[in-house]
């Protein structure tokens, strides 16, 4: 039964492939995201830029706020829990959330263990900086992987770094002889079966999205170019001058990332982008949480 549920959740996540998932804090924002063509929304009380600016401990959002967003849209709704916080995940499952993101954006509840996601019916999303992290989260039951990037910055450099690292490691593993996969699994600290899957198929066994710092249609197209199968956009939309227009442009750019002429048109007159933070100005590196 567990295997069947795991396969079902992975298939559900595959249905989001090629789409854009947007952070929203109100039902109105959720409707803007849905109208723009988002394949799902991430419900949270504060977008990552505000979480970073406010500091302090950040926790799961109020279930009443999440329910308001669930009622406002017909597309899937995701919500975040702290790394390792089993009770928060149970609460989200109880309110019938569509996906749970065990997220480094929130303050970690456990600095050693992640949630055993196989104990839940709802599919989980997890972040990763490299292939080892991704496969460890998948072994725990994650149905979807995203780059960690550096959320709330508007700077895409870490998402690029994480996606390039992951795709390079996948290529390297796929190129090994069969009898070298055991040693590779040991070095990655992952089960042999998962390493063998990547070796045989040249990809992760789950869908792999980009997240962290995506703020423009060009950013979204870049991440697709580098191997992402979809994009999360957080602060980049509702911290910009024209959220509705920018949201629609990013959705179209993600779906048509090879069309440079269209990308040029989509990038025109979008209003001011979020101000952002350069990588070397960041005080708290969220991507380092939960390896």
From Swiss-Prot:
Domain of life: Bacteria
Pathway: Cofactor biosynthesis; pyridoxal 5'-phosphate biosynthesis
Catalytic activities: aldehydo-D-ribose 5-phosphate + D-glyceraldehyde 3-phosphate + L-glutamine = pyridoxal 5'-phosphate + L-glutamate + phosphate + 3 H2O + H(+)
InterPro entries membership: Aldolase_TIM, PdxS/SNZ, PdxS/SNZ_N, RibuloseP-bd_barrel
GO terms for MF: pyridoxal 5'-phosphate synthase (glutamine hydrolysing) activity
GO biological-process terms attached to the record: amino acid metabolic process; pyridoxal phosphate biosynthetic process; pyridoxine biosynthetic process
Residues engaged in binding D-ribose 5-phosphate: 23, 152, 213, 234-235
Keywords from the UniProt entry: Lyase, Pyridoxal phosphate, Schiff base
Keyword Lyase: yes
Keyword Lyase: yes
Active-site residue numbers: 80 (schiff-base intermediate with d-ribose 5-phosphate)
Family statement: Belongs to the PdxS/SNZ family.
PANTHER family: PYRIDOXAL 5'-PHOSPHATE SYNTHASE SUBUNIT SNZ1-RELATED
Function: Catalyzes the formation of pyridoxal 5'-phosphate from ribose 5-phosphate (RBP), glyceraldehyde 3-phosphate (G3P) and ammonia. The ammonia is provided by the PdxT subunit. Can also use ribulose 5-phosphate and dihydroxyacetone phosphate as substrates, resulting from enzyme-catalyzed isomerization of RBP and G3P, respectively.
Designated name of the protein: Pyridoxal 5'-phosphate synthase subunit PdxS
Origin organism lineage: Bacteria, Bacillati, Actinomycetota, Actinomycetes, Bifidobacteriales
């Amino acid at each position: 039964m567990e295997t069947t549920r795991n396969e079902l959740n992975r298939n559900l996540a595959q249905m989001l492939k090629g789409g854009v998932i947007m952070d929203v804090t109100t039902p109105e924002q959720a409707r803007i995201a849905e109208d723009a063509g988002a394949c799902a929304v991430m419900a949270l009380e504060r977008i990552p830029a505000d979480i970073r600016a406010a500091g302090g401990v950040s926790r799961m959002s109020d279930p009443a706020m999440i329910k308001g967003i669930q009622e406002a849209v017909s597309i899937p709704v995701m919500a975040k829990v702290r790394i390792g916080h089993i009770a928060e995940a149970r609460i989200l499952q109880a309110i019938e959330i569509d996906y749970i993101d065990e997220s480094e954006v929130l303050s970690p509840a456990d600095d050693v263990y992640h949630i055993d996601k196989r104990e839940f019916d709802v599919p989980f999303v997890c972040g990763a900086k490299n292939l080892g992290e991704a496969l460890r989260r998948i072994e725990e039951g994650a149905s979807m992987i995203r780059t960690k990037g550096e959320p709330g910055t508007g700077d895409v450099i870490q998402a690029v770094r994480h996606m390039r690292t992951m795709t390079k490691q996948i290529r390297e593993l796929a190129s090994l002889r069969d009898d070298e996969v055991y040693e590779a699994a040991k070095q990655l600290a992952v089960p042999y079966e998962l390493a063998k899957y990547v070796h045989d198929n040249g990809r992760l066994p789950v869908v792999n999205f980009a997240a962290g710092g995506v703020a423009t249609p060009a950013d979204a197209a870049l991440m697709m170019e580098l191997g992402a199968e979809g994009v999360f956009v957080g602060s980049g939309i509702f911290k910009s001058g024209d959220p509705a227009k920018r949201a629609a442009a990013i959705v179209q750019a993600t779906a048509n990332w090879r069309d440079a002429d269209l990308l040029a048109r989509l990038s025109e007159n979008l209003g001011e982008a979020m101000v952002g933070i350069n990588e070397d100005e960041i005080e708290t590196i969220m991507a380092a949480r939960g390896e």
